[in-house]
Amino acid sequence: MRRLLLTFAAFAAFFQLATAQEYLPKWQEGYMDIHTIATGRGDATFIVMPDGTTLMIDAGDNGKIKDPQHPDTTKRAGEWQAIYMKKVMEDLPNKTKVDYAMITHFHDDHMGAVLQMLPGKNGLLPNSFISL
């Protein structure tokens, strides 16, 4: 019995490693995808609605160089977030910019990367914003 459990555990671990690098399934109409993008210096949430409308919630970069960045330090947090969102949007028809951007509050770890996504930088965000 112990040998069977060890074999099963080894198989489960191998399966986890084998599938860990697979990309997420492509967005399909009628489904909502929610992506949490963690950079180690500020996070973002990217949502693709069932109709293909996109929403970015926060785009953080706390600017503290001593904090570890993910996946690495070759780009700033906002650049990594933008790369990820653009990759997801490749599957969406006629989509080159995020439809809506929402900043929950005005702290760097929630909005510090917005300037890295404006038109003229990488052009991911819309040209106009509404502030309440």
Q: Model-flagged regions — what are they?
A:
Residues 1-4:
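Positively charged n-region of N-terminal signal peptides that target proteins for export
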Residues 7-16:
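Bacterial N-terminal signal peptides
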Residues 18-20:
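Boundary at the C-terminal end of the N-terminal hydrophobic targeting segment
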Residues 26-97:
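Conserved beta-strand hairpin/beta-sheet module of binuclear metal-dependent hydrolase folds
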Residues 64-67, 108-114:
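Extracytoplasmic/secreted cell-surface and envelope-processing proteins
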Residues 96-99, 127:
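Conserved acidic residues
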Residues 98-109:
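Metallo-beta-lactamase
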Residues 128-132:
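Short internal beta-strands
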